[in-house]
Amino acid sequence: MDSSFAERLVAWQKKYGRNNLPWQKSHDPYVRWLAEIMLQQTQVKTVIPYFDRFIERFPTVQDLAEAPEEEVMKLWAGLGYYSRARNLHKCTKEVQCRFNGSFPIELSDLESLPGIGVSTAAAIRSAATDEPCAILDGNVKRVLARHGMIGKGLTPRETENLLWADARSKTPLKEGRTYAQAVMDLGATVCTRTKPLCALCPVNQDCKAFQTDSQLEFPVKKVRAPVPEEILNLAVYTDGNEVRKSERYWKGLWTLPQLRDEEAEQSEEVLPAIEHRLTHLLLRIYPVRLPIPAKIPAAWKAFTKEQIKTEALPTPIRKLLLEVL
């Protein structure tokens, strides 16, 4: 175990780390799980108001498990990566069924639940119990890859295995909760992706990337395939109430009805186009304004402009509607 690395990070965390985040007030595994899921691919400052609203509305596993999915999606709307919200709801239902409503802390139990991977399970257990658990989220990968210059000339699988081995060797036997938060905070606030603040880093003296001025070369970037694109023609209806129906791109949310090309071409008013990046897809959205049809499909729902501000709509659709109505 690299005790020196851990000791420096723990000391740094106590003095400079983020120690007053709302979820840190509790060691309840349900609370820490909710925070960890929200923090996936999302910045802390964005998560905080969503976390506060969720905990206020769903203070227990049972509250979230018994809530309608539409209400969960409505509270989540705007946070992105919507499969997280669906897994969130599904997860609490499983906890109710399999663990009698008591959120588990064993790694194997956590990893068996929807939306919880190996690193997330470790982060939850460490936060809830203070036990040493190696974690390897995106921030931690960046710290370790730079510190040990790990990844050059290796396959992604080889790199992942080495990073996990390094994470385990550096995890201390004591103060697991503080260390886990420290290594995540270091990656989020100091060892950042584009402009690392290496002069402020507590482990810069033995960071190989810092010593060779090669920080931005790590983690080694994967060769990515071109992002596929899809075109959506969407109808904006503005005679009175706004009409919505659920579509496949934002499952569980309300969005605008999709049109065929020939239907879109019949519109007299074309609205500004939008580009929106999903996880593995670029959507090119072409909205057009149309009168409400005489016969409204049963799957559609009418919203007022005020409802658009609060209902479960994808961020680009909400923004579009508030701009054009």
For each feature predicted by the language model, list its residue ranges:
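Intrinsically disordered, low-complexity, charged terminal extensions of DNA damage-control enzymes
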Residues: 1-19, 24-25, 188-325
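Catalytic cores of DNA base-excision repair glycosylases
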Residues: 2-197, 203-212, 216
